[in-house]
A protein has these predicted regions:
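Extracellular glycan-recognition regions
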Residues: 1-147
């Protein structure tokens, strides 16, 4: 159980490399439990992520910006592609989603990582439940490209 992404214990991370990088993941959210959230995040000293949350049996695309959660839209189906694009020179990140892995839709505003966490900037996958224990989040594949 965790209240926010930063408190989640279920994370798998990759240190950011290069000046320009893109991380993309295929998320199968068919087995989420109520209160569960799963997705893709990017962190420096702030934790920002995009993912799916299940609330009262319904699935929502949502953004989490350093603990503040914003529902974007209700989604149907079982799978979604999530992407984060990073520009280290400009200290800028952007989050995207797609249902076909071709047409990615910008989700939320670009933001700065505010580097400062001792681990450095990282991208990663996460899953946590705000109500208790339970549910599953399947990450089919993860791709990380950088220059």
């Amino acid at each position: 159980k965790a209240a926010t992404l930063r408190e989640s214990r279920n994370m798998l991370t990759q240190k950011c490399m290069g000046y320009l990088s893109t991380a993309t993941v295929l998320l199968d959210f068919s087995a989420l439990a109520d209160g569960q959230r799963g997705g893709l995040f990017c962190t420096g000293s702030l934790y920002n992520g995009i993912g799916i949350s299940r609330e009262e049996g319904k699935n929502y695309l949502y953004l989490e910006k350093n603990g503040d959660v914003q529902q974007v839209k209700m989604v149907s189906g079982k799978k979604i592609y999530l992407r984060v694009m990073l520009d280290a020179k400009k200290n800028r990140c952007q989050l995207f989603y797609s249902f076909d892995n071709r047409n990615f839709i910008l989700c939320g505003d670009a933001y700065s990582l505010k580097f400062g966490d001792w681990k450095g900037a990282r991208v990663g996958l996460y899953s946590y439940n705000t109500l208790g224990i339970g549910g599953k989040c399947y990450f089919d594949w993860f791709n990380y490209d950088f220059n």
